[in-house]
């Protein structure tokens, strides 16, 4: 499995999609035979997984958007991305 770094440019794997689940009234990552519920923060990050933006770029954008510390945001983004990658929901 690839190592996640600030230069990684993740995207959703084939067959995985970001979708609003009406039954749960929550955003989820929908993959074959599984559903991963996303909280508000995870949703904002997952919406930026397009395969072109690095995690550092995503963190910088979010830091500016939410007036937050970029290094803290980057740590959180890398942690979330690592978790989702380990669940085989992302490609790098």
UniProtKB/Swiss-Prot annotation:
It comes from Xanthomonas campestris pv. campestris (strain ATCC 33913 / DSM 3586 / NCPPB 528 / LMG 568 / P 25). Functions as a PqqA binding protein and presents PqqA to PqqE, in the pyrroloquinoline quinone (PQQ) biosynthetic pathway. GO terms for biological process: pyrroloquinoline quinone biosynthetic process. Belongs to the PqqD family. Signal peptide: none annotated. Pfam families: PqqD (PF05402). Monomer. Interacts with PqqE. The keyword Amino-acid biosynthesis does not apply. One of its GO terms (molecular function) is quinone binding. Disulfide bonds: none annotated. This is PqqA binding protein. Keywords: PQQ biosynthesis. Pathway: Cofactor biosynthesis; pyrroloquinoline quinone biosynthesis. The keyword Mitochondrion does not apply.
């Amino acid at each position: 499995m690839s190592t996640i770094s600030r230069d990684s440019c993740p995207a959703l794997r084939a067959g995985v999609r970001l979708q609003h689940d009406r039954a749960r009234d929550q955003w989820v990552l929908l993959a074959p035979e599984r559903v991963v519920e996303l909280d508000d923060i995870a949703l904002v990050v997952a919406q930026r997984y397009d395969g072109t933006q690095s995690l550092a770029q995503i963190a910088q954008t979010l830091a500016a958007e939410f007036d937050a510390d970029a290094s803290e945001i980057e740590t959180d983004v890398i942690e979330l991305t690592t978790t989702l990658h380990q669940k085989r929901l992302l490609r790098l």
